[in-house]
């Protein structure tokens, strides 16, 4: 559905949109490359003080260490490459990174809940592994560019705007929207 053009696309089973399959190095499992169909995105970062759910990953049996299910972005029924969070206002906990930089509400999005070396959707902020994290201020209601993969983008975060309770991540067009609904 395209609200701007006021159009709706209907797909048949033959032309159904398919989820994105990504490949990356999974050093926790020692499987390189690891392939995974993206069917959920997890919020990762200091936004919630790095809180995580207890338990183990169903697929691997590895302990969960990085994310809380209540902040997961759910795959859209209309397009399997679009993920949506609609819920409580997101926390904006102030956290200091390992380089001494303090920000409130920093977040990016990942495919794994047991490792920080998965496939990520990060901001366009300048970041470099083992040198610096990057942080991008965003406005509610404004679509932002994103960088996907398993490179320096894992260290590039969005700063959640005040009052945000709605997030859309589009991994087909590499965009992120934070909003208040």
Regions found by a protein language model. Give the residues of each.
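Aromatic-rich carbohydrate-binding modules that target alpha-glucans
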Residues: 35-104, 115-140
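Structured interaction patches on ligand/partner-binding surfaces of diverse proteins
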Residues: 1-18, 116-178
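Primarily marks secretory-pathway-exposed extracellular/lumenal segments that are disulfide-
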Residues: 27, 180-181
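Short, conserved beta-strand segments of beta-strand-rich sandwich/propeller modules, principally
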Residues: 106-108
């Amino acid at each position: 559905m395209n609200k701007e053009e006021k159009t709706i696309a209907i797909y048949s089973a033959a032309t159904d949109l398919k989820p994105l399959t990504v490949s990356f190095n999974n050093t926790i499992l020692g499987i390189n490359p690891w392939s995974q169909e993206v069917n959920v995105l997890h919020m990762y970062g200091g936004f919630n003080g790095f809180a995580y759910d207890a338990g183990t990953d169903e697929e691997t049996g590895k302990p969960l260490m990085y994310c809380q299910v209540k902040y997961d972005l759910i795959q859209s029924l209309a397009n399997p490459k679009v993920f949506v969070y609609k819920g409580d206002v997101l926390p904006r906990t102030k956290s200091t990174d390992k380089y001494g930089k303090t920000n409130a509400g920093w977040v990016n999005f990942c495919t794994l809940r047991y490792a920080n070396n998965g496939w990520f959707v990060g901001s366009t902020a300048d970041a470099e592994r083992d040198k610096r994290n990057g942080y991008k201020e965003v406005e509610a209601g404004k679509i932002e560019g994103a960088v996907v993969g398993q490179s320096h983008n894992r260290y590039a975060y969005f700063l959640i705007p005040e009052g945000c309770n709605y997030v859309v991540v589009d991994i087909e067009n590499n965009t992120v929207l934070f909003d208040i609904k």
